[in-house]
């Protein structure tokens, strides 16, 4: 629309590397949301996207984030997919007084005035997931995870929860991000025979584990998902589309599934039918989309993209997003989110239970 002013927004997602698949979903969700805002007559401004691709290299996030802020006059950056990349960007946005909008699940135990956490942390994903699974399948667990912050912290939290509730951790193993040599994990699962497996692996490691576990279940009925499921906090609909039947019957927890029945999701999917009809919509896509919507709503409320004013305009105020009507906690900058337990069926997760 002619005459509309523009506010620059940084988009910082990788198109390659071991976590490229979910990162591409985040990128697509953010860019679609920017197109949605710019096409709307409701907003008297445009958002101008500036995208940098760190190519999956954690040490590039800080320099690219700094470049976005200093050279492109960006005050809001939507992006980062891993805790390593987020932690690289934090000192930059804190020093330069910008806001990083982080749209990926993480392990929790972090607060920054310059971050808005637009996805679930452990009390919003892992805790409700274990509360759902243990009474239904048992509390003897095998823990597998990526050998970095996400895997370490989620496994630690799971151990604490299980031990406090009388459960048992039969084994715990880590593999490097992207490592697909996971036969030793399957061998230990076969030996320990847990009630369920908590999968904190990432990307190709997780996909390889699910495929190998499917083969184990075909050889031994004890390891079929209806008897011993794999549960995850970071497995998205955009990922299971390429897994065939390997994910079928296993569980995840998320603040969003495409199959959710709500006025907000109905409106969101109608928007995407026009703007991004080929999208495989999942939580990461919806979270990145929601981050951009929150930026736009806050700018409209305060009349500026200044980080302090935007932060103040959001606190205690509800914003309608694909995730529902959400608000930012004034003390932690975390978004208050529901937890939906889903079971994989075909290319989607069917919602089994919603916990608020």
Residue ranges and their predicted role:
Residues 1-356:
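Extracytosolic ligand-binding ectodomains
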């Amino acid at each position: 629309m002619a005459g509309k002013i523009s506010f620059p927004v940084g988009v910082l997602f990788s198109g390659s590397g071991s976590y490229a698949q979910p990162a591409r979903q985040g990128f697509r969700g953010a860019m679609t949301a920017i197109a949605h805002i710019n096409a709307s007559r409701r907003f008297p401004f445009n958002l101008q996207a500036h995208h940098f691709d760190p190519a999956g290299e954690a040490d590039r996030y800080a320099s690219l984030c700094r470049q976005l802020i200093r050279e492109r006059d960006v005050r809001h950056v939507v992006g980062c997919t891993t805790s390593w990349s987020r932690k690289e960007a934090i000192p930059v946005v804190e020093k330069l007084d910008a806001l990083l909008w982080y749209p990926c699940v993480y392990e929790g135990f972090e607060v920054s005035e310059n971050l808005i956490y637009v996805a679930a942390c452990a009390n919003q994903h892992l805790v409700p997931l274990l509360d759902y699974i243990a009474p239904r399948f048992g509390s003897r667990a095998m823990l597998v995870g990526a050998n970095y912050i996400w895997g370490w912290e989620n496994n630690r939290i799971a151990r604490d929860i299980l031990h406090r509730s009388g459960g048992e951790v039969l084994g715990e193993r880590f593999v490097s991000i992207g490592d697909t040599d996971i036969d030793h994990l399957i061998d230990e699962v076969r030996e320990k025979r847990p009630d369920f497996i908590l999968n904190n692996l990432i990307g190709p490691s997780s996909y390889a584990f699910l495929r190998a576990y499917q083969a184990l279940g075909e050889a031994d009925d004890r390891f079929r998902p209806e008897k011993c499921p794999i549960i995850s906090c970071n497995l998205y609909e955009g990922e299971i589309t390429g897994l065939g039947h390997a994910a079928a019957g296993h569980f995840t927890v998320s603040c969003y599934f495409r199959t959710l029945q709500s006025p907000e999701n109905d409106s969101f999917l109608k928007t995407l039918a026009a703007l991004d009809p080929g999208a495989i919509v999942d939580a990461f896509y919806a979270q990145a989309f929601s981050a951009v919507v929150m930026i736009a709503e806050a700018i409209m409320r305060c009349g500026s993209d200044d980080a302090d004013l935007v932060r103040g305009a959001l606190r205690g105020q509800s914003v309608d997003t694909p995730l529902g009507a959400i608000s930012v906690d004034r003390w932690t900058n975390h978004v208050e989110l529901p937890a939906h337990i889903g079971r994989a069926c075909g290319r989607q997760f069917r919602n089994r239970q919603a916990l608020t």
